[in-house]
From Swiss-Prot:
Belongs to the universal ribosomal protein uL16 family. It holds the Pfam family Ribosomal_L16. Part of the 50S ribosomal subunit. One of its GO terms (cellular component) is cytosolic large ribosomal subunit. InterPro entries: Ribosomal_uL16, Ribosomal_uL16_bact-type, Ribosomal_uL16_CS, Ribosomal_uL16_dom, Ribosomal_uL16_sf. CDD domains: Ribosomal_L16_L10e. Keywords: Ribonucleoprotein, Ribosomal protein, RNA-binding, rRNA-binding, tRNA-binding. NCBIfam families: rplP_bact. This is Large ribosomal subunit protein uL16. One of its GO terms (molecular function) is rRNA binding. GO terms for biological process: translation.
Length: 139
């Protein structure tokens, strides 16, 4: 699973996923991309399961790019612990995905297969999404 090698701070503040993406909003490498139409936090397990779903459809010639990375840790207090006494320990890693962020890109396979691969990956993610062609703009 994806996670940073090291971070400056163990417990970051919660970053908002509201609003539109400033960067990473167009298909840069592949021919088709999977774009978030609403924002959310996507954890490393969901990214990994989407990656596996795409790679099963790619074959030998297909190419995939993962455009998001889980940089932020999410904390959680243990079960049956009273409130207070500090913030909980880091439990998992999430990527902050805003509206319009390109999450995955694919290329070098037939168009129908690319759409099938991105659709399967999209069903693994906790965001609403659409498939974007390279020439189109995600607005």
């Amino acid at each position: 699973m994806l996670q940073p090698k090291r971070t400056k701070y163990r417990k970051p503040h919660n970053v908002s996923y509201e609003g539109k993406a400033k960067g990473n909003s167009y298909v840069a490498f592949g021919e088709y991309g999977l774009v978030a139409t609403k924002g959310n936090w996507i954890d490393a397990r969901a990214i990994e399961s989407a990656r596996i779903a795409i790679s099963k459809c790619l074959g030998k010639t297909g190419k995939m790019w993962i455009r998001i990375f889980p940089h932020m840790s999410k904390t959680k207090k243990p079960l049956e612990v009273r409130m207070g006494s500090g913030k909980g320990n880091p439990e998992f890693w999430v990527a902050v995905v805003k509206q319009g962020t390109v999450m995955f890109e694919v290329a070098n396979i037939p168009e129908s297969q690319m759409i099938k691969a991105l659709t399967r990956a999209g069903h693994k993610l906790p965001v609403t999404w659409k498939i974007l062609k390279r020439e189109e703009v995600s607005a």
